[in-house]
């Protein structure tokens, strides 16, 4: 349903005022605080229309109006293009580039803390997921005559290691040749790139040690598919300072929610680009009274993880969207820069 310019202006002004003050907004408030060439009666009629259309609602204890989730959605959809088209000053890039590529966990923690400080809300940063990482290198270290320790490294510094049985008559040189061949064929591939046809080629190339190849691929697939979630939180108390969360039951639910890393990872893992979920658009009941702004960050042009900011539906969307978009961009730039300088 389209809104004429007058209704749009009134709706946006009410939302902006409510975000700032957390108090219902009435027609007299609008005429006193803002420049409207309209009478209070006309504004009241327009507000009544906006309420009938589902963009505003009236709390029982007030004559003023507050935005509904539909009102916020209209407001946010108008904002996103505008926020992303305005160049932002550098916020975090210098700090991120001080870390080495293998210090990805530190990078994630720094990003979470910075996001919370910049927005005054709660931040969530999903670290690089192994399933979205690219294979970097296999290394093997002899344990005894029947076993080697196989170490797998991804391009994001994630390391997995497992002991692997080998035939006792395999020389060090033969083992080295096998590892070199696997590295040559697999480097830069994600788990989805390792197709049945590629596995068939590897078996043919290394027919004498098919068992070792099979075990290596099994470890690789296991490591990529079953890695644990890595979610960093920042400012968990920030959201609890908002007036919407004075209810002790809500507070307990949120705090319990923040402790479940797997659930947090699930909430963030489907996000690519800039996404804003408002209220009941969120899939989890614990955050049905919240809004979540997320953006993905990338390495080598592919989505690697997600950063997010969780706050009340009365969130300062314009500021949060701009900050989240900028930090995601800077995190991508920092990771790409490390990739280039450390290769």
Swiss-Prot record:
GO function term, MF aspect, one: DNA binding
Entry keywords, A to Z: Repressor, Stress response, Transcription, Transcription regulation
GO annotation, biological process: negative regulation of DNA-templated transcription
Record-linked Pfam families: HrcA (PF01628)
Presence of the UniProt keyword Transcription in the record: yes
Purpose: Negative regulator of class I heat shock genes (grpE-dnaK-dnaJ and groELS operons). Prevents heat-shock induction of these operons.
NCBIfam families referenced in this protein's UniProt entry, alphabetically: hrcA (TIGR00331)
Family to which this protein belongs: Belongs to the HrcA family.
Protein's UniProt name: Heat-inducible transcription repressor HrcA
Organism classification: Bacteria, Bacillati, Bacillota, Clostridia, Natranaerobiales
Gene that specifies this protein: hrcA
